[in-house]
A protein has these predicted regions:
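A low-complexity, Ser/Thr/Gly/Pro-enriched, surface-exposed linker/loop concept
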Residues: 49-100, 127, 132-140
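Short, exposed beta-strand-loop hairpins at the edges of beta-sheets
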Residues: 112-114, 119-131
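Residue-level signal for tight coil/turn positions that link beta-strands
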Residues: 37, 46, 79-81, 108-110, ...
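Extracellular glycan-recognition/adhesion modules and their associated mucin-like linkers
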Residues: 27-43, 102-107, 112
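Bacterial N-terminal signal peptides that target proteins for export
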Residues: 1-11
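Surface-exposed interaction/gating patches
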Residues: 94-96, 104-105, 120
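Primarily extracytoplasmic ectodomains and periplasmic/lumenal surface modules that are beta-strand-rich
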Residues: 40, 46-51, 58, 119-120
Length: 140
């Protein structure tokens, strides 16, 4: 009887780290994240991912006539549809947001983002998305 309890305890202690790892893997992603440089901040809410680039030198398309606020520094992406620039008078910048290290992925509902030293690349399941850095903006 003692041997059986000892085996169960040993098995439980052996499996405990694996269970903890599995639980961590299934936690929802943080709703907000930033690049290690702090130049790009992203937030997911209401089915939309928005990323703001604080400082950029990339070329932006002409400002729409109805846009009277900041243009070219904010990009949005939903699980369906194409990425788009956003005319924004606010920001999603949060200096306390999770830092998505270079080489790490953010796996949100229907959208995946990769953080690299060259910037952030986000895409939805349909293959639409964007790649952005201080010097480059590509919508695809």
């Amino acid at each position: 009887m003692m041997l059986s309890a000892s085996i169960r305890l040993s098995a439980a202690l052996f499996l405990l780290p694996f269970v903890a790892s599995a639980q961590q893997a299934f936690q929802p992603p943080p709703p907000a994240f930033q690049t290690p440089s702090g130049n790009i901040h992203c937030r997911f809410g209401a089915g939309t991912l928005r990323c703001d680039v604080a400082e950029h030198s990339y070329a932006v398309p002409p400002r729409p006539r109805d846009c009277t606020q900041n243009w070219g520094g904010s990009i949005t992406l939903r699980a369906q549809g194409e990425a788009a620039l956003l005319c924004a008078g606010d920001t999603v910048r949060d200096d306390e947001a999770f830092v998505l290290g270079y080489g790490a992925d953010w796996l949100g509902p229907g959208i995946n983002c990769d953080s690299e030293e060259s910037g952030i690349r986000c895409a939805n399941r349909a293959g639409h998305g964007f790649q952005v850095s201080r010097t480059k903006l590509e919508l695809f």
